[in-house]
Structures are given as C-alpha cells and as structure tokens.
Amino acid sequence: MTQLAIIGATASGKSDLAIKIAKKIDAYILSIDSLSIYKEIDIVSAKPSKKELEDIKHFGIDFLHVDDYFSVDIFINLYKEVLQICKEQKKNLIIVGGTSFYLKSLIEGLSAIPKISKEQELHVEIKLKNLQQCYDFLYSLDREYMKNISAKDSYRIEKALLLHVGSSLTPSEWFRQNPPIPVIKNIDIFNIDVSRDILRERILNRTKKMLDLGLIDEVCHLEKKYTRLPHAMNSIGIVETLEYIDGFISKDEMIEKISTHTAQLAKRQQTFNRTQFDTIRSAPLEKLEDIILSTLA
C-alpha cells in the first residue's frame, strides 16, 4: 500500500490533482481541510462536487456537524481508521488539503493525555469562566510553556489546565515525560508551487464563484441553525458574509475582504509548507502530476 500527501495553498488546485492521481493509482482520499470536515459548510469550504465525491471515496469530508467538538487527536484517530480500511480493501491513500498542520501532527505525533474524570472536567469548566485568572495561574506555574500562548486563547488554556488537573504536573513536565510518538514514519509529500499573482487571481475568481453558488444563503442557513458561537463560524468567508448580512459592508466590499483574507491565509500556508517539513517536493501544478506518477512508478 502506498501513501502520499499533496499540499498547497488554498485555491492552488490540490483537490483536482488528488482526484486525477487517485483514479490512476486506485486510491482513496483523506482530506486535511479544517472546514470541509463539517457538514453543511459546502460553498465556503469549496468541497469537491457530489460527482467527484462519488467517483473517488473521500474521508474527512462531511464528518462532523458545525457545532461538534474537533481536535487534532480526533483527526489522528480518523486517519488510523482510514488506513485500516485502505489496507483491508487494498487501496492506496492520498492525503490532501490546505491544513498542513494535520499532516505535521501525523508525522510528529501527539503526546498522550492524562485521563480526566467528569468531576475534573466540571472543575476546569467552572474555572474557565474567569479565563484571565486561569491564564495567570498557569503562567505562574509554567512560564516557559505559557509564554507562547495568548491570554485569550481559551482552547489552549483549557488544554493546559486539564493537563495540570489530570496529572498534577506542569504542561512542560507532562510533555517531557510523555514525548510524542509519530503516526506516519515515511510519506512522500508534494507541494503545489504557485506564484502569488496567479494565486490572488484564482482566489478572487473562486470568491465570485462562491457568491454565484449561493454563499449568502449558505451562511444564513448556518447562522440560523447553529448561531455564531461554534468555532467554525469564525472562518474566512463566513465572518465577512455575516458582516454583509448585518449591513456593515457592501457586497463588493464583502468580496474584496474575503479575497484579501484568503490571500493572507494562502501566504501563511505557503510559509508553513516551506518551513515545517524536512523533505518536500515542490513544483507547478502542471508538472506535479508527472512528478508524482514517476515517483510511484
């Protein structure tokens, strides 16, 4: 069984390339996209079409409801399930998407976490009502660990507090005693190299297409069903559309803001992909298919 990963900035053509390769090497696809994993976020996430999803089996798409809890460890467990399915059905596996942090987590692994009782969870939940107090306590306990965490980062503060409550150790002590174990040891990683100008043009065109496909109706539906509280509702494309719905910006301003924020995200993705993987092969989209197939030959 062969595994490979195709990564790249948003709107770089990853999904189309992965589907092409999957058809040629008899592979399933595991999406590493932080929005496509949610049901009903279809237009904003630019999911593959229904036909494409029927032609090639995809995992990691429409996996959760918008208000479901999601973390990297859930994704890692999903990967393990998908890997087993591929082995049983004698299929290859292509990991594809723009959230390369998930891929990095598979390669580097995650540390085990202590078992947390219901009583401890409730204790932490009550404490978190005063987020600043929790942050100050953790900072005094483990300055080295907390100095890289914002006082407003409720997710990471909660994780750090749960670690301490469950283990009676500081986060730094816990991670020293429980180093991460890699989940994937060897995988070929291919990155789509695209110029910033071309990417900006693709992003603008995709934003306009999203509007034509019913972006505003989708966001209205999501807000009505889930409110604005779930983490996914803070995503690019949703936030700007809500600003338009609220009457704060015009439709043209909404398109401009979505395009600008998406381009900024793409720049961060390109930097991450370039700096966070030891071995990676980058090439323009039009050349990468041949490079991948020749590598697998």
From Swiss-Prot:
| EC assignment | 2.5.1.75
- Gene Ontology molecular functions: ATP binding; tRNA dimethylallyltransferase activity
Taxonomically, which superkingdom?
Bacteria
Pfam families, alphabetically? IPPT
Q: Where does substrate bind?
A: T10, A11, S12, G13, K14, S15
- Catalysed transformations (reactions): adenosine(37) in tRNA + dimethylallyl diphosphate = N(6)-dimethylallyladenosine(37) in tRNA + diphosphate
Required cofactor(s): Mg(2+)
**Keywords of the record:** ATP-binding, Magnesium, Nucleotide-binding, Transferase, tRNA processing
Main EC class the enzyme belongs to? transferase
Name the residues that bind ATP. Answer: G8, A9, T10, A11, S12, G13, K14, S15
Kindly state a single biological-process term from the GO annotations of this entry: tRNA modification
Q: Kindly give the InterPro entries that the UniProt entry links to this protein.
A: Dimethylallyltransferase, IPT, P-loop_NTPase
Specify where the region named Interaction with substrate tRNA lies, as residue ranges: 33-36
| Marked site positions, Interaction with substrate tRNA | T99
Q: Provide the function of this protein.
A: Catalyzes the transfer of a dimethylallyl group onto the adenine at position 37 in tRNAs that read codons beginning with uridine, leading to the formation of N6-(dimethylallyl)adenosine (i(6)A).
UniProt cross-references to PANTHER family, sorted A to Z: TRNA DIMETHYLALLYLTRANSFERASE
> How is the subunit organization of this protein annotated in UniProt?
Monomer.
Q: Can you tell me which family this protein belongs to?
A: Belongs to the IPP transferase family.
Please give the name of this protein: tRNA dimethylallyltransferase
Q: What is the lineage of its organism?
A: Bacteria, Pseudomonadati, Campylobacterota, Epsilonproteobacteria, Campylobacterales
Point out the gene that encodes the protein. miaA
